[in-house]
């Protein structure tokens, strides 16, 4: 895991997947900036709660300046590819949600109970399996908590 406390993270896109990732990153202390003209209800809620900074406009190259990480999560494959390429050129860790070959890291499913945190990934190959294992871990963590 990375220490994300105070890390400057860019998310381009504001759909359901982007909102889930923004929420997790913010919960781990990242300073999350979202770039997208429009987005889903969950992203609007994160903005209302002050968990993210949302710039309601299209992506520009300068949006990558000074970032630790950049996540390209739009429905435009060519834009995601451009963000990943330009981010790598700037030395930023990038995740292109639509192309695992362009990812410097995979975004895991997170199971968290108090100070215990587990991340599950199938290296971008099987999202359903990773989600299933994450849910089982969450259930197990709950049973451990209730047994104490």
Predicted region positions:
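Hydrophobic beta-strand scaffold residues
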Residues: 32, 54, 91-94
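Structural motif
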Residues: 8, 68-69
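ADP-ribose/adenylate-binding Rossmann-like module
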Residues: 69-74, 80-106
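Hydrophobic, well-ordered beta-alpha structural blocks that scaffold small-molecule cofactor pockets
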Residues: 1-46
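Glycine-rich, highly charged phosphate/nucleotide-binding loops
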Residues: 47-62
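Short loop/edge segments at beta-strand edges and connector loops
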Residues: 36, 54-58, 98
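Residue-level detector of alpha-helix initiation sites
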Residues: 16-17, 77-78, 124
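Adenosine-phosphate binding glycine-rich loop
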Residues: 111-148
